């Protein structure tokens, strides 16, 4: 097999692959065997039909097409390895020349695919970053204390109009064109939380128990999702939350402290820690922006456009040109950021240990309220484990860059970020880049060996087979049926 590569743009190449009859022979043999299992020809058992009979009843063209389809991905993967390109997205294949019916002559393929662009990595040592100063106010501590008190509060029924912060029990009926499309009874809702449909807070404001009103809103789910419906709401009861007194007794009930002053002091520390974390988040965002300012990274247009299209389809906003432009800009920046961190991870020889991957997957499962094994199985089914490994590697790359930076607050005080830039694994055994067949429990279990991978989320090619541009021909089994 011979391969040449033509650079179409900084982010796209064309592979010209020439496969000899010898290269194609194993796939020809496989095609005959597979077709023999499919077709029913009088006088022959399934799987025992000889090639000459298949040629006669099905046609040599069907055999060739089957062989090419069977071998195309292998030829493509071999070409990728031979040319050292870094594919992104789904390749598109075109058969330029078929072997002759006598199985002589080469198979000529042209495959276009987006590739990772080359660029010079900007210097990232000693970058200076300025973040907000940390100052905890009494009001912030009071807000945290009130939040804690609310968790220990009790709901008391009141005979007055509902207001923000009250809990109401309501019945809802949605109608479209005079027909009821959805109903719900006995819903408990905190007025002002915004957890239900648009317009519900305004509609409930000032209503008392037993009163009803109507308003219009778009439905968020069900068969009529996205349609505007008339919503009838009836208030069954209004309750307010009665908070416990902020005293020593409350401190002893709600915490390990004996006095309310000790509890307030601890809440102040917790608010401070949260703000320090905010400083680190600020620094992380700044450092990525600074690095991107210093380098030009070409973006694969088709890859970005496909992502934008998927995003807009999910939001049902395909006609919103302003939003399309916003999503495109965001997608392009995300791609550049991913690629930049991928290259830094490679330069720093960062590895992803099994334990690091496990912790990341467990956190992801918690975010989606799923069991870890269930979450991993979903990722495996969608071949997304390598992408998760890439995410962990990029996070580690960002930690390395942040560790090399100088971070100060607005007052010039140095911000200690070492807690968030712990030493990273650099020389571990490699995690498989194709773990999709792994047992789910093994993926999320603690492992004695540290493993790593070079699997950035954008590099999808190993899991993608070339998509043919040519129209599909009739299946071999259909041809056999036509010839009988």
Swiss-Prot record:
Check the record and name the HAMAP family matching this protein. Trigger_factor_Tig (MF_00303)
- Kindly state one GO CC term assigned in the UniProt record: cytoplasm
PANTHER family in UniProt: TRIGGER FACTOR CHAPERONE AND PEPTIDYL-PROLYL CIS/TRANS ISOMERASE, TRIGGER FACTOR-LIKE PROTEIN TIG, CHLOROPLASTIC
- What species is given as this protein's source? Clavibacter michiganensis subsp. michiganensis (strain NCPPB 382)
Biased composition annotated in UniProt, kind: Acidic residues: 430-440
The Gene Ontology biological process annotation of the record reads: 'de novo' cotranslational protein folding; cell division; chaperone-mediated protein folding; protein transport; protein unfolding
Its gene is tig
Which EC numbers does the record give? 5.2.1.8
Gene3D superfamilies in the record, alphabetically? 3.10.50.40, Trigger factor ribosome-binding domain, Trigger factor, C-terminal domain
Q: List each copy of the PPIase FKBP-type domain by range.
A: 165-244
Membrane-spanning regions, if any?
none
Q: Region Disordered: list its residue ranges.
A: 429-484
What protein name applies here?
A: Trigger factor
